[in-house]
């Protein structure tokens, strides 16, 4: 039995939401989109992420969400994404979110280089999730 039924009045077509983002990415010639806002994660995954989390959306194919390792299994269970597309990071060398996501993104890019879209802005709501200056600098240096 399918997990979702398109005839259900509460059905939300999450794969189509991803395709819509990918269509917009193509218009802007983006190879990867790095989402960090709480609303973006919920809107694309159908899961709640109480910890710092990110979603990497490639130009084609399924996105991958990254969250704190202790919450990854629960987030994967809540999401329409399978467990191979909801990964955990940990505050240890090589397993922190910047290192893990950077390596993941580089594998998606031809020759490890490409155009990456990020979420940027400001909000009065603290957990909004825009990239912090620290995260932006670390990602920029790691992906340069």
Can you describe what each PLM-predicted range is?
Residues 1-144:
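A composition/biophysics-driven feature that prefers long, compositionally simple stretches
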């Amino acid at each position: 039995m399918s997990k979702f039924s398109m005839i259900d009045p509460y059905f939300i077509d999450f794969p189509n939401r991803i395709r819509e983002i990918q269509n917009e990415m193509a218009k802007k010639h983006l190879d990867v989109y790095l989402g960090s806002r709480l609303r973006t994660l919920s809107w694309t995954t159908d899961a709640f992420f109480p910890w710092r989390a990110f979603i990497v959306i490639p130009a084609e194919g399924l996105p991958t969400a990254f969250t704190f390792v202790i919450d990854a299994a629960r987030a994967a269970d809540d999401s329409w994404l399978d467990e191979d597309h909801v990964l955990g990071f940990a505050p240890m060398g090589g397993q922190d979110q910047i290192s893990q996501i950077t390596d993941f993104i580089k594998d998606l890019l031809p020759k490890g280089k490409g155009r990456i879209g990020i979420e940027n802005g400001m909000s009065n709501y603290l957990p909004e999730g825009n990239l912090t200056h620290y995260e932006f600098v670390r990602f920029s240096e790691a992906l340069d």
